[in-house]
Amino acid sequence: MQTKTVTVKLDKHCYDIIIGPGLVAQAVWQIKHSLHKKDLHQTRFALVTDSNVASLHLDTLQAELTKNKIHTVPIIVEAGEQSKSFLTLQIVIDRILAARLERGDCVIAFGGGVIGDLGGFAASIIRRGMNFIQMPTTLLAQIDSSVGGKTGINSRYGKNLIGAFYQPQCVIADTCFLDTLPLREFRAGYAEIVKYGLISQPDFFEWLEKNWQKIFSNGPTRTEAIVRSCQFKADIVARDEHETGERALLNLGHTFGHMLETATAYDSNRLIHGEAVAIGMVLAHQFSAQLNLINPTLIQRVEAHLKAVGLPTQLKDIPGKLPEAETLMTLIAQDKKVSQNNLTFILTRGLGQSFIAKTVSPEAVLAFLEQKLAEIR
């Protein structure tokens, strides 16, 4: 299967997202090309990964690098959202500094979204910025979190509240890694693909409705979905790198979704990010309908598609008890899009007609949350 390349074109930095099977075998060439180096013998690499990816794929990557006489420093953290913390960040930083890696050396984030965010944030602050390469191993990371330069960790006050924009030198998305991805994780990544259609690509959403089963089977349709998703996000990031405008549209479903992740204490047994986004997108459409922005039939269509692939779509699908509406409101108030204490949501006027809604009434949001919680109690 042919390798595809999507280029992220920024004002001060351009980089490639390379997509296709068997890219680990080409990793050395891709890394040399992206770092503009003839050889890598004098460059050391911190391989930041998690316990799950390490057990499945780390030996393969290390063998490829070692074969080319490249020095590596593997750094393995616990798998899961809870590793996006100050404690784990400190561990990663200490390992890199103890190995005396320099600014001209490189951090490779080898894993899913958590590892990309964690490794990228470490690279951004060590020696005021090291070389950084993303090697995403999950669908969600390949089509979303590895693209665009967002890095960071969570706080007890909310998700992704501590971080930096720090673009990688390249993204190497080997689709073979998806063959070992648990179905639950694949579904979670698919939610972010659906998001791209709902934002402003109704034709893409309709294509997903017809082709989702092929995407869940390894083949050219899966690669096409990944490429189209990366291209869509790359185009938005190129126009708005630091999220001062339209890039906020990429947060469709995330205001409610991040609220739910924080409310469940980032417990992956209850909820993972893509699942939270799926529920969040349904909530965003329901809230839009409550504000008389859309016909309720669109909610049914969106929810039906997410359910068809096995994603949760309602609060009742989350195991365990959720906090009261007032507590959930305090979590929403910490959302990154809040400006001058005004709530900002990504809402919709129709299929593929999402927009940034500023100064949303807190009273309307609170009443909506109370209604949704009442439905499950």
UniProtKB/Swiss-Prot annotation:
EC assignment: 4.2.3.4
Q: Please name the GO terms of the biological process aspect recorded for this protein, alphabetically.
A: amino acid biosynthetic process; aromatic amino acid family biosynthetic process; chorismate biosynthetic process
Highest taxon above the source species: Bacteria
Provide the leader sequence positions.
none
Subcellular compartments? Cytoplasm
Provide this UniProt record's keywords sorted from A to Z.
Amino-acid biosynthesis, Aromatic amino acid biosynthesis, Cobalt, Cytoplasm, Lyase, Metal-binding, NAD, Nucleotide-binding, Zinc
Q: Which residues bind Zn(2+)?
A: E192, H254, H273
Does the keyword Metal-binding feature in the UniProt annotation? yes
InterPro entries listed in its UniProt record = Dehydroquinate_synthase (IPR050071), DHQ_synth_AroB (IPR016037), DHQ_synth_fam (IPR030963), DHQS/DOIS_N (IPR030960), DHQS_C (IPR056179)
Looking at its record, which EC class is this enzyme?
A: lyase
Task: Please share the entry's free-text remark on the cofactor.
Answer: Binds 1 divalent metal cation per subunit. Can use either Co(2+) or Zn(2+).
Pathway participation? Metabolic intermediate biosynthesis; chorismate biosynthesis; chorismate from D-erythrose 4-phosphate and phosphoenolpyruvate: step 2/7
Q: Which GO terms describe its molecular function?
A: 3-dehydroquinate synthase activity; metal ion binding; nucleotide binding
Which Gene3D superfamilies did the record assign? 3.40.50.1970, Dehydroquinate synthase-like - alpha domain
The reply to whether Zinc figures as a keyword in the UniProt entry is yes
Give me the Gene Ontology terms describing cellular component: cytoplasm
Residues that coordinate or bind NAD(+): G113, V114, I115, G116, D117, T137, T138, K150, K159, F177, L178, D179, T180
Q: Which CDD domains match?
A: DHQS
**Swiss-Prot/TrEMBL cofactor(s):** Co(2+); Zn(2+); NAD(+)
Per its record, the protein catalyses:
7-phospho-2-dehydro-3-deoxy-D-arabino-heptonate = 3-dehydroquinate + phosphate
Which Pfam families is this protein grouped with?
Answer: DHQ_synthase (PF01761), DHQS_C (PF24621)
Disulfide bonding pattern of the chain: none
Q: What family is reported?
A: Belongs to the sugar phosphate cyclases superfamily. Dehydroquinate synthase family.
The job of this chain, per UniProt, is described as: Catalyzes the conversion of 3-deoxy-D-arabino-heptulosonate 7-phosphate (DAHP) to dehydroquinate (DHQ).
Q: Which NCBIfam families match?
A: aroB
Name of the protein in its database record: 3-dehydroquinate synthase
Question: What organism does the record attribute this protein to?
Answer: Bartonella quintana (strain Toulouse)
The top of its lineage is: Bacteria, Pseudomonadati, Pseudomonadota, Alphaproteobacteria, Hyphomicrobiales
